[in-house]
Structure formats: C-alpha cells, structure tokens
C-alpha cells in the first residue's frame, strides 16, 4: 500500500510539499528534504515524533565542528520548526553526519543527484523506515525528471519562507531565523535587507523571460558573499530577502548610487537580449538594513507597501529608490491605508483630483503629475518643468491653475509639506 501510494504521488507529479507531508505521516516522524547545497526545500513535522537518541551529531569541515543536539529535536513538539531544522541551520553548506536513529536517502536518477531526504527518529514501520524513505525519494526523482527548468524546488522553498514571514506563521524570531538559515539565508552576525525588484516599461519579450533575467541578475549581484531568497508577488514584483556579511560595500548607503545597484546593472548588461527596448528599466527598492529578524520583516514590509517611488539614483538599466533616503515617502505609504490619513489626503487634494477626472476644454488631466514634479523640485521650476515634460510656459500655467483650485500659495513651505504628504498618502509618485 505504501509502495502504491508513493509511486502514484510521483506519477501524478504531486506537489513536493504534499509528498513530504505524506512521508512524514507514514513514518510518524519529521521528514526534511534538502537540495544538493544542503538547503532545506520542504519539511513536515509528523503527527508525533518518537523520542530517540540523545547523542550529538558532529559535522567537521576544515577543523570546524557543528554540534547538533538530537535530544532537543526528539523532545520538541511535533511542529517545533526551530528544533527540527536546527541541524540544517548550523551546517553552512556542509554535510551532516547523521546521529543514531536518523535515516537519509539520496534523491537521484539517471546520474543526477538533486538532494536528500532525511527522516528524524520515529517508531519502526512494517515496511522499514528506510524503504519508505527510498520510495519517497523515487517519487520526488520522477518529479524532478519532469521539471525541465529545474527551478521547482527553489521556488517552493522561497514561497514557503515568504508565506511564513509575511503571514506571521512562526512563534518567535529565533524560530524564523532558524527556518531562514536552514534554507540558505544566514541571519546571525549578518546585515539583513528587504528589497523589491520589478521591470518598468515594455520588455519586448515574454514576462517569464523578464522575470528569469531579473532573478538571475539579482542573485549574481548578491553572490558570492551575500545570500538571497526571492519570490514573485501577485503582481510579478520580485520580493527579496538579502543577507550580507558586515562591512560588505554593496550595502553602503553613503554614496550617490548604491553599489548593489551598480553590480545589478552590470549583471543585467550581461543577460539582457540585444532586442530589449531602450526605455526598459529594472527598478530596485531597498529597505533599511538591519541586524535582527524584526528589522528584516519591517524592511521588507515597508518596501512592499511603498510601491513605486521616483528614483533617487540610476545606473545603467537600474533605477533605485531607498528607504534610508526617502523616509517620509516610505512612512506615508505605510500609513496611507488608515482612514484618518485617507480622509486627510482626499480633503487636501479633492479639487485637483476632481479636475483631473473630467475631460473637455481646460481639463488637461495631468495636474496631479504636474504637482508631483513641482514638489520634487520646489526651488527649481525649470527642472520641474523638464521632469514633467512640459514647456516652462505651459508648466507655469498648470501651477497657477493648481493654486487657484486649491486656494494655496505653492511657494509657501507649509503648503509644500502638506501637499507632499497628501500626495504620498493618496498613492501619488512624488
């Protein structure tokens, strides 16, 4: 029965996480799938892990020893991610020497080895724990043979982690840190940054190619010292969790252009097809770097909520917005969903928005964009007109109309501050 079930799962190309769950239920023990770099792809806690050996597993690499307490794993609650995944969180890409009572089999076929399946201590199974694990590995190997792109495991691991992080599916920060580290994103002693990356303009080819190039370029820009976990959101924007060693120059915010953006631009220049339209850009949004899990979560959430903002820097095909250099914009985008802020923005901009909604003579429909350009350069109207792509005379006429509609003086500092906040809260791009 077990053989039939697991074979059917493989032939049906059942989702990897579902296969792991069924294996865990069958063995009544935690089961972990790792890739060839020893990063956790998927895991399941099992309905009740049996207390097993109390020895420690030691993994040695170039004189360094990683100690894994199997007692901690054995006595953990069945959904204790921190205890179950701790061995993988401490590996740093090294192989794990299995403690007594653990079973591991390779996921491989036709000379390709994609990773390993590990079962933690549990009760004996009539068919044999190792036999069940081997059948599960066979089912996973069948699925990998059918995965021509070879990205399924990476996508699954990334999506799982973002679901955990953004959905609050963890009990405390150390549990989340363990899950991230086990999946290849080291946390302890690292500088952590949340970011988003999206293509702007016509790419000239299929969306899947654009996404693949953006993801590959960002991974290369972060490597080799940095680590990244990436996944697309519902709109296609690439969400990123980045981890760098302390002092890494790529996250230095002191210069006019973030070094990470320059590195990304270089990688894109090596990957983009010659047919890519000249106006296409990759827009990178960088959150505030931090050293704690809570800071990483805040960093990612703020760049997600902020959406697109005008670039503070550009290099090659890359434009950049930075939370550290645009704190007001990020703050107001974060508060824009609150009723009080929405009401403030609507009241402050109502005549202008109403004017833009109506067509006909005298209604250009671009007053919001004109105001955005002016507020970005309030002391240089010539530059603001250039940014708005209008002649100076037409631009000045639009400003006069805005002052008339809103009953304000656009040269007044308080007015500039009020309208800047209102536009940001309303979702404008100023």
Model-derived segments and spans:
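Alpha-helical/coil-rich non-catalytic "connector" segments in signaling and regulatory proteins
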Residues: 1-163, 188, 225-226, 267-270, ...
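Cytosolic nucleotide-utilizing catalytic cores of signal-transduction proteins
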Residues: 152-430
């Amino acid at each position: 029965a077990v053989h039939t079930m697991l074979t059917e799962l493989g032939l049906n190309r059942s989702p990897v996480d579902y296969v792991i769950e069924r294996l865990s239920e069958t063995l009544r023990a935690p089961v972990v799938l790792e890739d060839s770099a020893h990063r956790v792809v998927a895991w399941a806690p099992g309905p009740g892990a049996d207390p097993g050996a109390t020895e420690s597993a030691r993994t040695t690499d170039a004189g360094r020893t990683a100690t894994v307490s199997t007692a901690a794993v054995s006595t953990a609650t069945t959904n204790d991610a921190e205890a179950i995944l701790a061995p993988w969180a401490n590996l740093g890409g090294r192989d794990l020497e299995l403690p007594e009572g653990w079973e591991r089999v390779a996921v491989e076929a036709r000379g390709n080895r994609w990773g390993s399946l590990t079962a933690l201590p549990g009760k004996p199974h009539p068919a044999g724990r190792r036999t069940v694990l081997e059948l599960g590995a066979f089912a996973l190997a069948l699925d990998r043979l059918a995965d021509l792109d070879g990205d399924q495991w990476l996508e699954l691991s990334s999506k799982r982690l973002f679901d955990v992080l953004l959905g609050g599916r963890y009990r405390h920060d150390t549990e989340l840190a363990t899950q991230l580290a086990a999946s290849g994103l080291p946390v302890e002693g690292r500088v952590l940054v949340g970011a988003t990356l999206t293509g702007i303009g016509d790419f000239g080819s299929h969306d899947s190619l654009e996404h693949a190039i953006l993801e590959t370029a960002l991974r290369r820009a972060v490597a080799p010292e940095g680590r990244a976990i990436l996944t697309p959101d519902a709109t296609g924007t690439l969400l990123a969790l980045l981890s760098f060693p302390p002092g890494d120059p790529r996250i230095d915010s002191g210069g006019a252009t973030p070094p990470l953006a320059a590195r990304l631009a270089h990688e894109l220049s090596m990957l983009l097809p010659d047919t890519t339209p000249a106006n296409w850009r990759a827009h990178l949004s960088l959150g505030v770097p931090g050293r704690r899990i809570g800071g990483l979560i805040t960093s990612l959430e703020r760049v997600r909520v902020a959406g697109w903002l005008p670039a503070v820097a550009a290099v090659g095909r890359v434009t950049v917005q930075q939370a550290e250099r645009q704190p007001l914009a990020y703050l107001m985008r974060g508060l824009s969903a609150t009723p009080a802020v929405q009401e403030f923005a609507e009241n402050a901009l109502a005549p202008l928005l109403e004017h833009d909604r109506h067509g006909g003579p005298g209604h250009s429909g671009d007053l919001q964009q004109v105001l955005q350009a002016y507020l970005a350069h309030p002391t240089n109207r010539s530059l603001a007109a250039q940014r708005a792509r209008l002649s100076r005379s037409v631009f000045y006429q639009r400003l006069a109309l805005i002052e008339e509609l809103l009953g304000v003086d656009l040269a007044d500092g308080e007015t500039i501050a009020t309208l800047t906040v209102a536009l940001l809260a309303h979702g404008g791009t100023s």
